[in-house]
Amino acid sequence: MKTTIQILTCKLITNVCKLFKKNGTVYPGSIALKINGKVLESIKYPKYVIGVTGSSGKGSTTSMLAHILKDNGLNVVWNSSGSNVLNGTATLILNNTNAFTHKLKADVLLLEMDESYIKKTFTKSTLTHLVITNITRDQPARNGEPEIILNKILSSIDENTEVIINADDPFVNRFSFLHKGPVCTYGINKTSYDLKKPISNNVDAAYCPICHKKLKYTSYHYGHLGVYSCPTKDFVRKTDFTGDNLNLENKEMIINGNKVKLNKDVFFAAYYTLAAYSAASEIGLTDTQIMHALNENTLESKRLKTLKLDNREVDMLESKNENNLSYVQSLNYINNHKGPKTIIMGFDNVSRRYKYNDISWLYAVSYTH
């Protein structure tokens, strides 16, 4: 009875919020959780409960995966609003759950999830799949070191969850031997856009986590993501789903022998497309089904908007605040487009989210490369 009351309360508050033209994506769930903080444990979830997490790219990956699944006729409940912490997730789940049977009405529950909130949201065995995009230096005042985030994610799941990981990131690739359940890996082979040396001398995850010798990189995609090997072969970069022949000018690449369109001519578009492809395949979709969604019904990019202003074309890029690699990718996009251009950059130079006046992440951005 308590669960029924919580579900009805959440739905009622959501409708009241909409009546007053408020989003109502977070507050209703917070009220429901105050009644019973463990209400999400009482929900009957669908066969597939997929989480997507990481320092950056989780929103784009979630959107792309939702597009692929819906294009193939699956009923997908997902947090399209971007509310990825506990209260927002609770609002989404309760609003899509039958108040009397407590069954979530979907084929797939797909969630963009903040790395620090997975454990606070679900019990360890709730997620059937977890996609991990990358682990980088991100929002340092809140998250601290990348190692802390890795351990938070690892402690949030058990052997019942399949992890789908970006093997190009040595931090994330540690799940290949630390996680006790099934592991699926994806990565992008050497491209014409790679660097032989990193932009910054302070590269995270530069050493093998097993033998502790310095990793040997054939090439760097960006940051510490790239093609690498351990000198003693203790730590292996292996990919089940592989991106080849990346062509940003034509917005395409090859995934496991199939030519795939990208919806944006930036490197991280290749990553979130490959991650979504891998996850969709792991839950049973065929290459043909995935290719149709990517190549025939292309998803419009939300992070890159093109506008017209006084007969000029304006590209507006959205980068994640307090994440240096996200800014670097935007700068790479600008640098790769030749010809004269006017550049306007904006950011909150001091974090307003915490009591700390943290600006350290700005110094890790290479503005002159």
Predicted regions and their residues:
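Phosphate-binding loop of NTP-binding sites
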Residues: 2-187, 197-207
